[in-house]
């Protein structure tokens, strides 16, 4: 009721810190079924917030939703397994970083660009531990930026359904 109606589109970017490949073993323990149990308070809070995000999305069954998180541990979580997932690479949307990123969406035909391959010329090489790519960016705001072309694509495909 605070919104003045229901949203047509929902975009969610839950905190990736405890799901990231770089910090996953600091925050999580792999269970027998593949789920990643929290072992830090930060990870437990991240799971609560992410699950609340999914609950809020469920309040609006007619909305198109997109949930974004860099490819990593979130895709292993039990609570996200029933959501359709796609993986994009930021370089295919004009960024100089490859940054494989998972997008969960109920859009019937999101038509995301195919992922590029490691070593392709469309992105800067960023081997683990290097100072290039996302890991070379100094602040969270810069590391979290979503390419404009990907945002424009999401707007376009959402408008096709909502209009």
Question: Where do the model's predicted regions map?
Answer:
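Conserved active-site and SAM-binding loop architecture
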Residues: 1-163
């Amino acid at each position: 009721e605070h919104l003045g109606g229901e949203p047509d589109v929902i975009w969610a970017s839950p905190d990736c810190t405890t799901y990231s490949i770089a910090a996953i073993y600091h925050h999580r323990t792999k269970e027998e079924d593949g789920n990643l149990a929290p072992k830090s308070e930060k990870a437990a809070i991240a799971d609560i917030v992410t699950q609340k995000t999914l609950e809020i999305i469920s309040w609006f069954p007619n909305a198109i939703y997109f949930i974004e998180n860099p490819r990593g541990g979130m895709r292993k979580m039990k609570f996200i397994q029933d959501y359709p997932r796609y993986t994009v690479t930021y370089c295919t949307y004009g960024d100089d970083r490859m940054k494989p990123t998972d997008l969960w969406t109920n859009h019937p035909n999101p038509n995301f660009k195919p992922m590029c391959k490691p070593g392709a010329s469309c992105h800067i090489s960023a081997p683990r531990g290097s100072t290039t790519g996302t890991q070379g960016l100094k602040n969270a705001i810069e590391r979290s930026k979503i390419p404009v072309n990907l945002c424009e694509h999401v707007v376009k495909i959402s408008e096709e359904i909502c209009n």
